[in-house]
């Protein structure tokens, strides 16, 4: 899936490519010399991230000749290995997320990033040397997938609700989300079965799952951290409007205290 701006004159410009290689998706951005986002792509990797990397780079380089590419940087779980394969520069994903948030949204003081296999809380402060924000502190989830996007994916498959769009829209219909265990997928499944037996409406169960993930994040990743406002919510899960609602309510965020970046899935790249 691509998000493309007006095509620049490739004969007179040079570009940078950023790649975030995760367990679920490959996120690619093309930047110009002024760090403007020219194009960005979100591709599901389907268990073959390096095959998708090859296909995406081939596609980009057909449009933007290699002579115009000044640099390639990579991050994510597959970033270090891929950097060795294609000769790019590997960047730690905490640094990548903090840098993009600090440059594009300098007023943000907390970053919540939830991807397919991990979740992060990043604290920022204003850098007195420029107009950007800089990294102060961070925390990540444990090895358990309960606080990540895969938690929602697993539960969505169990109740046969497409995760891409319908899941979030369905959650927004709920006015009484039931409490569902969010710390363990096994317990969540048990709670879901229980609520189905009670004839709890499906949209309420879906909303309950969103709130379960948000509460799990608050009580684990953010348990010892102050969540300063405004909060920037990035990662693929930020596309889920049910999760946006859940974080607003769980963290008591009003109006512009919660920022959803236009390129929320590609912030790491």
What name fits each language-model region?
Residues 5-34, 108-128:
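Gly/Thr-rich phosphate-binding beta-strand-loop-beta motif of the actin/hexokinase/Hsp70
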Residues 33, 41-45, 60-95, 122-123:
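Short beta-strand-loop/turn "lid" adjacent to the catalytic site in phosphate-handling enzymes
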Residues 57-70, 217-229:
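Phosphate/pyrophosphate-binding loops at sites that engage ATP/ADP/AMP, CoA/4′-phosphopantetheine
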Residues 190-219, 262:
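Adenine-nucleotide phosphate-binding core of ATP-dependent small-molecule kinases
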Residues 13-58, 132-138, 142:
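Short glycine-rich, Thr/Ser-proximal phosphate-binding strand/loop in the N-terminal lobe
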Residues 78, 223-250, 260-265:
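Glycine-rich phosphate-binding loops at beta-strand->alpha-helix junctions
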Residues 166-204:
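A mobile "lid/hinge" subdomain adjacent to the ATP/sugar-phosphate binding pocket shared
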Residues 48, 126, 134-172, 262-265:
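Glycine-rich phosphate-binding loop plus the immediately following alpha-helix
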